Every structure is written in structure tokens, then in C-alpha cells.
Amino acid sequence: MYRAKHDGRNCFRFFTAEMQIHSSRRLQLENALRRALERDQLSLHYQPQISLQDGRIIGAEALLRWQHPELGMVSPAEFIPIAEDSGLILPIGEWVLRTATQQLKAWMDQDMEPMVMAVNLSAVQFRHAHLPDLVTQILEEAKLPPQYLELELTEGVAMDMTKLHC
């Protein structure tokens, strides 16, 4: 039903065993994702950004990862769309922003050279009315100047913006 709705008006789909498997997996992941934040199953991996001129680390990108105790490592390509569709992306995104800024501040407090922390935003987060206030609050909590936070928009955000303006 959701697939037919997604495809647009006057569409229909025949229910198949493959759809049942996909639907069951999606429901399983959504329920598990609801508990993942509480159970500390989400983590950030930091990918360094290197200057091509001199080889210095000039930044890091915070990459969200999910290690489920039974399912193992769940791909972001699989769980991010579920988080977006279910509304879980907002608390998860807040956790990512908060954790990444705290980590950067901790590195800077250890006398590491200042650098930029890049955090990806989904279309859902980008459209959320309270995003500017949330970012300001998190930066203030971490005592981190705003020039050290880089918000990256995914391709999905650009596609959504294109649809809005067409």
C-alpha cells in the first residue's frame, strides 16, 4: 500500500512474497532503531578531511553507524530512509549533532589544531523549523564557535528543493 501511494495517484501494486519480506525487515529495523539510541548502539566514525596542499588534517566528517547486537552492522543506506519516514531522524540527528560537536570540542581542548566538523543533514532535518535554534543551542552547550561546524546537505535535500521550486 505504501509503495503504491509513493508511486502516485491511480497506481496499484500486487502484493508479493518479496514485498512481505521487505515490509517485515523494514518494520523490524524501525522497531530496533527506536531502541538503538537508548541502548547506545549508534556511533559516529570520523573521516578525516585532508588538505591537498600540505597533507594536514583540516576537518572531519561525522559518519553515523549502527551496530545492532543481532543483525550486526546495519547500512546507513538501509536505516536512514527508515529513520526519515518514521520521524526518528530528528532525535537521531540531534544526537549526531550534539555528539560530533562535543567530540570536536574535546579534541580542541586537548590542544589539537582547530578544524571543521562536517555533519550531514537529511531533508527532514533541513525542513524542520527548529533546526537553527537547535544548532545554536548545541554549539552553545559545547562552547564551540559556529565557524567550526559545517552542515552538509544530502542529495535528497537538493532533490526535495528542486521539487518544491518546479
Please give the residue ranges for each predicted region.
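Short, intrinsically disordered, charge-balanced linker/junction segments flanking boundaries
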Residues: 146, 160-166
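Conserved glycine-bearing catalytic or ligand-binding loops at nucleotide- and phosphate-handling centers
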Residues: 1-15, 20
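Flexible, glycine-biased helix-capping/connector loops in cytosolic signal-transduction modules
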Residues: 7-10, 40-42, 147
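Bacterial c-di-GMP phosphodiesterase EAL domain
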Residues: 17-144, 156-157
